[in-house]
Amino acid sequence: MTSSTSQITGSIVALVTPMLDDGSVDYPALRKLIDWHIAEGTDCIGVVGTTGESPTVNVQEHCEIIRVAVEQAAGRVPIMAGCGANCTAEAIELTQFAKKVGADCQLQVVPYYNKPTQEGQYRHFKAIAEAVDLPMVLYNVPGRAVADMAHDTVLRLAQVPGIVGIKEATGQIDRAQWLIREAPKGFAIYSGDDPTAVALMLCGGHGNVSVTANIAPRLMHELCVAAMAGDTKRAMEIQFKLLPLHKNLFIEANPIPVKWAVARLKLCGGTLRLPMTPLTPANEAALESALHASGLL
Protein backbone atom coordinates (compact mmCIF):
# COMPACT_ATOMS: atom_id res chain seq x y z
CA MET A 1 0.00 0.00 0.00
CA THR A 2 1.47 3.33 -0.96
CA SER A 3 2.12 5.99 1.66
CA SER A 4 4.21 9.10 2.03
CA THR A 5 6.42 7.10 4.38
CA SER A 6 7.28 4.77 1.52
CA GLN A 7 9.26 7.72 0.21
CA ILE A 8 11.89 7.13 2.92
CA THR A 9 14.95 6.29 0.87
CA GLY A 10 18.68 5.99 1.23
CA SER A 11 20.79 5.09 4.24
CA ILE A 12 18.72 3.91 7.19
CA VAL A 13 21.05 3.16 10.08
CA ALA A 14 20.15 0.13 12.19
CA LEU A 15 21.29 2.02 15.25
CA VAL A 16 23.11 0.44 18.18
CA THR A 17 21.72 1.06 21.65
CA PRO A 18 24.47 2.68 23.77
CA MET A 19 24.86 1.15 27.22
CA LEU A 20 26.84 2.09 30.31
CA ASP A 21 29.30 -0.27 31.98
CA ASP A 22 26.54 -1.53 34.30
CA GLY A 23 24.40 -2.46 31.29
CA SER A 24 21.85 0.33 31.65
CA VAL A 25 20.82 2.26 28.55
CA ASP A 26 22.94 5.38 28.05
CA TYR A 27 20.30 7.85 26.88
CA PRO A 28 22.64 10.89 26.68
CA ALA A 29 24.93 8.88 24.39
CA LEU A 30 21.90 7.87 22.30
CA ARG A 31 21.04 11.54 21.82
CA LYS A 32 24.61 12.35 20.77
CA LEU A 33 24.63 9.45 18.30
CA ILE A 34 21.43 10.68 16.69
CA ASP A 35 22.83 14.19 16.30
CA TRP A 36 26.04 12.78 14.81
CA HIS A 37 24.15 10.65 12.30
CA ILE A 38 22.06 13.58 11.18
CA ALA A 39 25.20 15.68 10.72
CA GLU A 40 26.85 12.85 8.77
CA GLY A 41 23.99 12.49 6.29
CA THR A 42 22.07 9.46 7.55
CA ASP A 43 18.65 9.60 5.89
CA CYS A 44 16.59 7.72 8.49
CA ILE A 45 17.31 6.29 11.94
CA GLY A 46 16.08 2.83 12.88
CA VAL A 47 15.97 2.07 16.60
CA VAL A 48 15.42 -1.02 18.73
CA GLY A 49 15.92 -3.55 15.99
CA THR A 50 18.32 -6.47 15.92
CA THR A 51 21.37 -4.21 16.04
CA GLY A 52 19.72 -2.17 18.80
CA GLU A 53 19.56 -5.29 21.00
CA SER A 54 15.77 -5.39 21.09
CA PRO A 55 15.78 -8.96 22.48
CA THR A 56 17.55 -7.85 25.66
CA VAL A 57 15.85 -4.56 26.51
CA ASN A 58 12.68 -4.67 28.56
CA VAL A 59 9.40 -3.15 27.41
CA GLN A 60 9.90 0.07 29.39
CA GLU A 61 13.39 0.55 27.94
CA HIS A 62 12.16 -0.33 24.46
CA CYS A 63 9.53 2.39 24.64
CA GLU A 64 11.88 4.95 26.17
CA ILE A 65 14.48 4.40 23.43
CA ILE A 66 11.81 5.13 20.81
CA ARG A 67 10.59 8.20 22.71
CA VAL A 68 14.09 9.64 23.15
CA ALA A 69 14.97 9.00 19.51
CA VAL A 70 11.87 10.79 18.25
CA GLU A 71 12.43 13.68 20.64
CA GLN A 72 16.09 14.07 19.71
CA ALA A 73 15.57 13.79 15.96
CA ALA A 74 12.90 16.48 16.27
CA GLY A 75 11.69 15.94 12.72
CA ARG A 76 15.12 16.38 11.14
CA VAL A 77 15.11 12.79 9.87
CA PRO A 78 12.46 10.06 10.09
CA ILE A 79 12.53 7.53 12.92
CA MET A 80 11.82 3.90 12.05
CA ALA A 81 10.78 2.28 15.32
CA GLY A 82 11.39 -1.42 15.83
CA CYS A 83 8.08 -2.71 17.20
CA GLY A 84 8.37 -6.40 16.38
CA ALA A 85 7.39 -9.25 18.67
CA ASN A 86 6.43 -12.88 18.27
CA CYS A 87 3.20 -12.09 20.11
CA THR A 88 0.79 -10.08 18.01
CA ALA A 89 -0.76 -8.32 21.00
CA GLU A 90 2.66 -7.20 22.24
CA ALA A 91 3.61 -5.93 18.79
CA ILE A 92 0.40 -3.90 18.71
CA GLU A 93 1.15 -2.38 22.13
CA LEU A 94 4.67 -1.36 21.06
CA THR A 95 3.31 0.11 17.85
CA GLN A 96 0.63 2.07 19.69
CA PHE A 97 3.36 3.63 21.83
CA ALA A 98 5.53 4.42 18.79
CA LYS A 99 2.62 6.19 17.14
CA LYS A 100 1.78 8.08 20.34
CA VAL A 101 5.28 9.57 20.64
CA GLY A 102 5.55 10.45 16.95
CA ALA A 103 7.62 7.76 15.22
CA ASP A 104 7.41 8.02 11.44
CA CYS A 105 7.04 4.32 10.74
CA GLN A 106 7.34 0.91 12.35
CA LEU A 107 9.59 -2.03 11.50
CA GLN A 108 7.90 -5.40 12.05
CA VAL A 109 9.99 -8.56 11.99
CA VAL A 110 8.62 -11.98 11.06
CA PRO A 111 7.63 -13.61 14.37
CA TYR A 112 10.58 -15.62 15.65
CA TYR A 113 10.79 -18.91 17.59
CA ASN A 114 7.11 -19.87 17.28
CA LYS A 115 7.45 -20.27 13.48
CA PRO A 116 4.04 -19.16 12.17
CA THR A 117 2.75 -20.44 8.85
CA GLN A 118 2.42 -18.09 5.89
CA GLU A 119 -1.23 -17.56 6.82
CA GLY A 120 -0.19 -16.86 10.41
CA GLN A 121 2.33 -14.30 9.24
CA TYR A 122 -0.25 -12.64 7.03
CA ARG A 123 -2.80 -12.39 9.84
CA HIS A 124 -0.16 -11.15 12.31
CA PHE A 125 0.96 -8.21 10.18
CA LYS A 126 -2.56 -7.44 8.97
CA ALA A 127 -3.82 -7.30 12.57
CA ILE A 128 -1.11 -4.81 13.54
CA ALA A 129 -1.78 -2.65 10.49
CA GLU A 130 -5.50 -2.60 11.23
CA ALA A 131 -4.97 -1.84 14.93
CA VAL A 132 -2.55 1.08 14.57
CA ASP A 133 -2.41 3.67 11.81
CA LEU A 134 1.39 3.85 11.53
CA PRO A 135 3.14 2.96 8.27
CA MET A 136 4.67 -0.51 8.50
CA VAL A 137 7.86 -1.85 6.97
CA LEU A 138 7.99 -5.64 7.04
CA TYR A 139 11.27 -7.31 8.02
CA ASN A 140 12.21 -10.69 6.59
CA VAL A 141 15.30 -12.21 8.21
CA PRO A 142 14.96 -16.00 8.23
CA GLY A 143 18.52 -16.45 9.45
CA ARG A 144 17.37 -15.09 12.80
CA ALA A 145 13.61 -15.58 12.82
CA VAL A 146 13.79 -19.14 11.35
CA ALA A 147 10.43 -18.51 9.68
CA ASP A 148 10.73 -17.11 6.15
CA MET A 149 8.19 -14.80 4.53
CA ALA A 150 7.31 -16.18 1.12
CA HIS A 151 7.15 -13.96 -1.96
CA ASP A 152 3.40 -14.40 -2.36
CA THR A 153 2.84 -13.48 1.30
CA VAL A 154 4.76 -10.23 0.81
CA LEU A 155 2.61 -9.42 -2.23
CA ARG A 156 -0.59 -10.13 -0.25
CA LEU A 157 0.58 -7.89 2.57
CA ALA A 158 1.56 -5.16 0.12
CA GLN A 159 -2.17 -4.77 -0.59
CA VAL A 160 -2.99 -4.12 3.08
CA PRO A 161 -3.51 -0.41 3.86
CA GLY A 162 -0.63 0.89 5.95
CA ILE A 163 1.95 -1.71 4.92
CA VAL A 164 4.39 0.33 2.86
CA GLY A 165 7.56 -1.71 2.34
CA ILE A 166 9.89 -4.51 3.34
CA LYS A 167 13.40 -4.84 4.70
CA GLU A 168 14.65 -7.84 2.73
CA ALA A 169 17.55 -9.27 4.74
CA THR A 170 18.11 -12.64 3.11
CA GLY A 171 20.93 -11.35 0.92
CA GLN A 172 19.31 -13.15 -2.04
CA ILE A 173 19.23 -10.59 -4.81
CA ASP A 174 16.92 -12.67 -7.00
CA ARG A 175 14.24 -12.50 -4.29
CA ALA A 176 14.56 -8.73 -4.14
CA GLN A 177 14.42 -8.48 -7.93
CA TRP A 178 11.15 -10.39 -8.05
CA LEU A 179 9.70 -8.10 -5.39
CA ILE A 180 10.84 -4.99 -7.25
CA ARG A 181 9.29 -6.44 -10.41
CA GLU A 182 5.94 -7.48 -8.94
CA ALA A 183 5.19 -5.33 -5.87
CA PRO A 184 2.69 -2.50 -6.33
CA LYS A 185 3.98 0.95 -7.17
CA GLY A 186 5.01 2.83 -4.05
CA PHE A 187 5.85 -0.30 -2.05
CA ALA A 188 9.44 0.21 -0.90
CA ILE A 189 12.07 -2.54 -1.07
CA TYR A 190 14.96 -1.97 1.32
CA SER A 191 18.06 -4.09 1.71
CA GLY A 192 18.84 -5.44 5.14
CA ASP A 193 22.16 -6.95 4.09
CA ASP A 194 25.15 -4.62 3.71
CA PRO A 195 27.25 -6.81 1.38
CA THR A 196 24.48 -7.06 -1.23
CA ALA A 197 22.71 -3.73 -0.67
CA VAL A 198 24.41 -1.96 -3.56
CA ALA A 199 23.17 -4.63 -5.98
CA LEU A 200 19.62 -4.36 -4.66
CA MET A 201 19.60 -0.58 -5.05
CA LEU A 202 21.06 -0.74 -8.55
CA CYS A 203 18.13 -3.04 -9.39
CA GLY A 204 15.66 -0.40 -8.24
CA GLY A 205 15.61 -0.82 -4.46
CA HIS A 206 14.87 2.14 -2.24
CA GLY A 207 17.66 2.04 0.35
CA ASN A 208 19.64 0.07 2.87
CA VAL A 209 18.89 -0.62 6.53
CA SER A 210 22.54 -0.75 7.46
CA VAL A 211 24.78 -2.00 10.25
CA THR A 212 27.85 -0.52 8.55
CA ALA A 213 26.23 2.93 8.68
CA ASN A 214 26.78 2.91 12.45
CA ILE A 215 30.45 3.67 11.87
CA ALA A 216 30.56 4.95 8.26
CA PRO A 217 27.35 6.96 7.89
CA ARG A 218 28.58 9.48 5.34
CA LEU A 219 30.03 6.81 3.06
CA MET A 220 26.86 4.72 3.31
CA HIS A 221 24.73 7.75 2.48
CA GLU A 222 26.91 8.50 -0.55
CA LEU A 223 26.77 4.86 -1.65
CA CYS A 224 22.97 4.86 -1.48
CA VAL A 225 22.69 8.12 -3.41
CA ALA A 226 24.97 6.81 -6.16
CA ALA A 227 23.35 3.38 -6.39
CA MET A 228 19.79 4.70 -6.49
CA ALA A 229 20.83 7.16 -9.21
CA GLY A 230 22.26 4.31 -11.27
CA ASP A 231 25.84 5.56 -10.90
CA THR A 232 27.42 2.11 -10.80
CA LYS A 233 30.99 3.37 -10.99
CA ARG A 234 30.71 5.64 -7.96
CA ALA A 235 28.59 3.17 -6.00
CA MET A 236 31.13 0.40 -6.50
CA GLU A 237 34.05 2.66 -5.59
CA ILE A 238 32.44 3.19 -2.20
CA GLN A 239 31.34 -0.44 -1.93
CA PHE A 240 34.89 -1.69 -2.44
CA LYS A 241 36.08 0.70 0.27
CA LEU A 242 33.45 -0.60 2.68
CA LEU A 243 33.78 -4.31 1.88
CA PRO A 244 36.20 -5.03 4.77
CA LEU A 245 33.63 -3.56 7.15
CA HIS A 246 30.70 -5.42 5.58
CA LYS A 247 32.63 -8.65 6.15
CA ASN A 248 34.10 -8.07 9.59
CA LEU A 249 31.07 -6.46 11.19
CA PHE A 250 29.56 -9.93 10.94
CA ILE A 251 32.62 -11.88 12.04
CA GLU A 252 30.59 -12.72 15.15
CA ALA A 253 26.86 -12.39 15.74
CA ASN A 254 25.53 -8.87 15.22
CA PRO A 255 25.73 -6.55 17.19
CA ILE A 256 28.88 -7.86 18.89
CA PRO A 257 31.37 -6.53 16.30
CA VAL A 258 29.65 -3.19 15.69
CA LYS A 259 29.44 -2.52 19.43
CA TRP A 260 33.21 -2.99 19.61
CA ALA A 261 33.69 -0.75 16.58
CA VAL A 262 31.61 2.17 17.90
CA ALA A 263 33.62 2.02 21.11
CA ARG A 264 36.90 1.86 19.19
CA LEU A 265 35.88 5.00 17.30
CA LYS A 266 34.81 6.64 20.58
CA LEU A 267 31.24 7.14 19.38
CA CYS A 268 29.73 5.50 22.47
CA GLY A 269 30.42 2.67 24.88
CA GLY A 270 30.58 -0.90 23.65
CA THR A 271 28.82 -2.68 26.51
CA LEU A 272 26.60 -5.60 25.53
CA ARG A 273 23.94 -7.44 27.51
CA LEU A 274 24.08 -11.18 28.00
CA PRO A 275 23.78 -13.51 26.22
CA MET A 276 25.86 -11.32 23.90
CA THR A 277 29.52 -11.40 24.93
CA PRO A 278 32.46 -9.16 23.95
CA LEU A 279 34.33 -9.62 20.69
CA THR A 280 37.21 -12.08 20.96
CA PRO A 281 40.78 -10.70 20.79
CA ALA A 282 41.44 -12.42 17.45
CA ASN A 283 38.35 -10.85 15.93
CA GLU A 284 39.20 -7.48 17.46
CA ALA A 285 42.40 -7.55 15.43
CA ALA A 286 40.50 -8.41 12.25
CA LEU A 287 38.00 -5.60 12.77
CA GLU A 288 40.78 -3.16 13.65
CA SER A 289 42.39 -4.00 10.32
CA ALA A 290 39.06 -3.45 8.54
CA LEU A 291 38.66 -0.03 10.14
CA HIS A 292 42.07 0.95 8.81
CA ALA A 293 41.38 -0.54 5.36
CA SER A 294 38.17 1.46 5.08
CA GLY A 295 39.87 4.69 6.12
CA LEU A 296 38.10 5.10 9.46
CA LEU A 297 41.33 4.90 11.46
From Swiss-Prot:
GO terms for molecular function: 4-hydroxy-tetrahydrodipicolinate synthase activity. It is found in: Cytoplasm. The record marks 50, 113 as: Part of a proton relay during catalysis. GO terms for biological process: diaminopimelate biosynthetic process; lysine biosynthetic process via diaminopimelate. Pyruvate binds at residues 51, 209. Pfam families: DHDPS. Keywords: Amino-acid biosynthesis, Cytoplasm, Diaminopimelate biosynthesis, Lyase, Lysine biosynthesis, Schiff base. The keyword Amino-acid biosynthesis applies. Its main location: cytoplasm. It is an enzyme of class 4 (lyase). The keyword Glycoprotein does not apply. One of its GO terms (cellular component) is cytosol. It catalyses: L-aspartate 4-semialdehyde + pyruvate = (2S,4S)-4-hydroxy-2,3,4,5-tetrahydrodipicolinate + H2O + H(+). PROSITE patterns: DHDPS_2. Its EC number is 4.3.3.7. HAMAP family: DapA. Belongs to the DapA family. Homotetramer; dimer of dimers. This is 4-hydroxy-tetrahydrodipicolinate synthase. It comes from Albidiferax ferrireducens (strain ATCC BAA-621 / DSM 15236 / T118) (Rhodoferax ferrireducens). The gene is dapA.
